Amino acid sequence: MEIGLREWLIVIGIIVIAGILFDGWRRMRGGKGKLKFRLDRNLSNLPDDDGSAELLGPPRVLDTHKEPQLDEHDLPSMSAPVREAREPSSKRGKRANAGVAEPHQGDLNLDVDEGPSFSSRDDDFPDENAGKNAPRQSVNDQPPAEEVLVISVICRDAAGFKGPALLQNILESGLRFGEMDIFHRHESMAGNGEVLFSMANAVKPGTFDLDDIDLFSTPAVSFFLGLPGPRHPKQAFDVMVAAARKLSQELNGELKDDQRSVLTAQTIEHYRQRIVEFERRALTQKR
C-alpha cells in the first residue's frame, strides 16, 4: 500500500510530539535533583538545634519599668502638720515672701492658661464666686480622712515625668503647691477656698521640691481625695478625674486605681458609688 503525503505528516507529527514529551520528562527529572540538592545545601548551613534553642522559643520581654512602691497608706495625711522643720532656714525664708501655699510659682515664668475645660468645671460648685475671695483653707483644718479615693498616673517613659512639664500641666489644672510640700486643688482656680483634692509624688516621701524642679523627675504621681473632705465630693471627684486624665494624655501616662490596676469606666463609677455610700452613712450618723 502506497503511503501518501498526509500519512507522512501524521507520522512526523507523532514523532515530534513524542520527542517534546520525552525532553520535558527528562528536564523535570533533572530539575528535581537540582532542587533537592539546593535544599540540602541550604539546610546544611543552618546551625545545630543545640546551639540555637533560643531561636525557637517565644520572645521574652524584660520588665525594666517597676512601678513606684507607694500605696494608699503612704499618702500624706490631710490632717498632718506642715513639715517645715526639715527645711533649711534659707529655704523657708524664700517661701515666706510668697506665702506658705504658693512659693516661687510666680518665679517659674510659666504661662498658665486656665483652659475652658477646667474653668467650666468650676461652675459645679455653687459657692465658687464667694470662694475666689475667701481665704485659702488649710489642710490641717480638715477632719481626718476616713476613706481615700486614689488615682495614680504612671509615666510610660522610662525617664518619668519631667519636673517643668509636670508643673506646667498641673498648674493648668488649677493645682497649687502648698502645705506638706504637695499640690492641692482648691475650690477656686486661683487657689482660694476649700481643698478639693491633692496630688503627691508617688516616690517616698511623696513630696516635691520647687527649688529643684528643673532637675526633678518622677515615675508617677498620685491624686487623692479624702472623705470627709470637700462639701461637694462628687463634683470634686469629677475635677480630680479630669486633672488625672489631662496629665496622662499630655505627658504619656497611664491611669491606675488604688489597687494599681488599669483605671476603667467601671472603676470610676465604683468610686462615685463609694462617695454616695459614704454620704449616706454620714447622714445616718447625724440622725
Swiss-Prot record:
SMART domains referenced in this protein's UniProt entry, alphabetically: ZipA_C
PANTHER family for this protein: CELL DIVISION PROTEIN ZIPA
Stored InterPro entries: Cell_div_ZipA, ZipA_FtsZ-bd_C, ZipA_FtsZ-bd_C_sf
Gene Ontology biological-process entries: division septum assembly; FtsZ-dependent cytokinesis
Encoding gene, per UniProt annotation: zipA
Record field: transmembrane: 2-22
Family indicated by similarity: Belongs to the ZipA family.
Protein name: Cell division protein ZipA
Membrane topology label: Single-pass type I membrane protein
GO cellular component, as recorded: cell division site; plasma membrane
Disordered: annotated segments: 70-143
Subcellular location: Cell inner membrane
Segments in the Periplasmic topological domain: 1
Lineage: Bacteria, Pseudomonadati, Pseudomonadota, Gammaproteobacteria, Pseudomonadales
Side of membrane Cytoplasmic, spans: 23-287
Source organism of the structure: Pseudomonas fluorescens (strain SBW25)
Annotated NCBIfam families: septum_zipA
Top-rank taxon, per record: Bacteria
Assigned keywords, A-Z: Cell cycle, Cell division, Cell inner membrane, Cell membrane, Membrane, Transmembrane, Transmembrane helix
